């Protein structure tokens, strides 16, 4: 199953997050969406820490959303890289 870390657009607009979810749906690929901001302006520290660990990073500075992982756990990247993954 794909994992998509990002923002729920009802809370924080993220066109690329929406596009990633839409692409996976169109491709009929199961995915788990992990919302890193449950409330406006409030990050889920546990989910951010999980994501940073997966990426081997110690800071979220410069980190863009979404961040997508393949079913095997490998990091794909953002929406543009996800689109390339399916070409």
Swiss-Prot record:
Name under which the protein is recorded: Glutaredoxin
SUPFAM superfamilies found in the cross-reference section: Thioredoxin-like
Q: Its family?
A: Belongs to the glutaredoxin family.
Q: What does this protein do?
A: Serves as a reducing agent for the phage-induced ribonucleotide reductase, but not for the bacterial ones. This specificity may be the result of sequence differences around the redox-active disulfide bond. The oxidized form accepts electrons from bacterial glutathione and will, in turn, reduce other small disulfides. Can also be reduced by NADPH and by bacterial thioredoxin reductase.
Question: Could you tell me the keywords of this UniProt record?
Answer: Deoxyribonucleotide synthesis, Disulfide bond, Electron transport, NADP, Redox-active center, Transport
Q: Which InterPro entries match?
A: GLR_AS (IPR011767), Glutaredoxin (IPR002109), Thioredoxin-like_sf (IPR036249)
Instruction: Supply the gene name.
Output: NRDC
Q: Name one GO biological process term.
A: deoxyribonucleotide biosynthetic process
Glutaredoxin domain boundaries: 1-87
Tell me the impact of changing residue 15 to G: Almost no effect
Say which species the protein is native to.
Answer: Enterobacteria phage T4
Q: Which cysteines are joined by disulfide bonds?
A: 14-17
């Amino acid at each position: 199953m794909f994992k998509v870390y990002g923002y729920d657009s009802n809370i924080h607009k993220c066109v690329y997050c929406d596009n990633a979810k839409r692409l996976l749906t169109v491709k009929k690929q199961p995915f788990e969406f992990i919302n890193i901001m449950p409330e406006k302006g409030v990050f889920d520290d546990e989910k951010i820490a999980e994501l940073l660990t997966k990426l081997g990073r110690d800071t979220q500075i410069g980190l863009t959303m979404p961040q997508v992982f393949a079913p095997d756990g490998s990091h794909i990247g953002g929406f543009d890289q996800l689109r390339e993954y399916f070409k």
